Amino acid sequence: MQIDIQSRDVFYVSDGTAITCETLGHVVLGQFPFEANEKTFPFVESEDKLSDLLKEIEISYRATGHEPLVFFSIVIPEIKLKLLDAPAHCYDVLESIVQKVQDDTKMAPKPKLQRSRSVNKDSDKYFDRIAAIEYTLAHDDGITLKGLEEADIILLGVSRSGKTPTSLYMAMQFGLRVANYPFIHDDIARLRLLPEFEIYRHKLFGLTIDAERLTEIRENRLAGSEYASDSQCLYELQTVEGLFRREAIPYINTSSLSVEEISTRILERTGLRRRLL
């Protein structure tokens, strides 16, 4: 008997990166025969962020007639309580999930081994990941500015501001093609936006860092050099941040953030969607 595959809206919500919610949610939803329309809401740690989330839930409910499924990890009591009052089926990722999803969707779980699964689909994901990694490595640290039309995003920043690890993480975990370009000493003296970037302004995103942290990182690489001096680091950062503001390039400070947090915040700020789940 053919099963009628339904479509359900699914939200992943966290006051952190939401990566844990996504991971557990994907495992659980893989046991149910419906297509998931997924949205991720990381860093829901303020009333403003919560308000935006609740509006999205309300829109989903009114548009589909079904309460969306919300996988969440929230430690702030006030936000958690308000989320639980929303017109949605909410699952704390630390609770038992599968049985509750079964109850709410009125569907019996179907383990992956009992469902048809496309090997080609998994192969496609594998090759997409490899292609993203190869592109990112080929466009690391300004190696080449050719092929920028294929980039999903172009990261800019001073040397040692976190561009390379962030680029590789986004390629490996999200399947995104990321180019990055460092503003080196020669660039800083006459800093301007390169002509090659003009038609890709919508792809540009800046990374900056506290001067003290940058000095510490550079000292570990070239101790005692002008490159690592307090004055040089401060000068470079002030100049590059001025360019970001002047050219209206969005940017974030990476000083206290992990690579996972940097990558997730970039997705949040740009609206980019990950290609791999």
Swiss-Prot record:
Write down the superkingdom of origin. Answer: Bacteria
Q: What class of enzyme is it?
A: transferase
Q: Which UniProt keywords apply?
A: Kinase, Nucleotide-binding, Serine/threonine-protein kinase, Transferase
Q: Would I find Zinc-finger among this entry's keywords?
A: no
- One Gene Ontology term of the molecular function aspect: protein serine/threonine kinase activity
Reported EC number(s) for this entry are 2.7.11.33, 2.7.4.28
Reactions mediated catalytically: [pyruvate, water dikinase] + ADP = [pyruvate, water dikinase]-phosphate + AMP + H(+); [pyruvate, water dikinase]-phosphate + phosphate + H(+) = [pyruvate, water dikinase] + diphosphate
UniProt-annotated binding residues for ADP: G157, V158, S159, R160, S161, G162, K163, T164
Q: Please explain the role this protein plays, according to its UniProt record.
A: Bifunctional serine/threonine kinase and phosphorylase involved in the regulation of the phosphoenolpyruvate synthase (PEPS) by catalyzing its phosphorylation/dephosphorylation.
Family classification: Belongs to the pyruvate, phosphate/water dikinase regulatory protein family. PSRP subfamily.
Classification via HAMAP family: PSRP
UniProt name for this protein: Putative phosphoenolpyruvate synthase regulatory protein
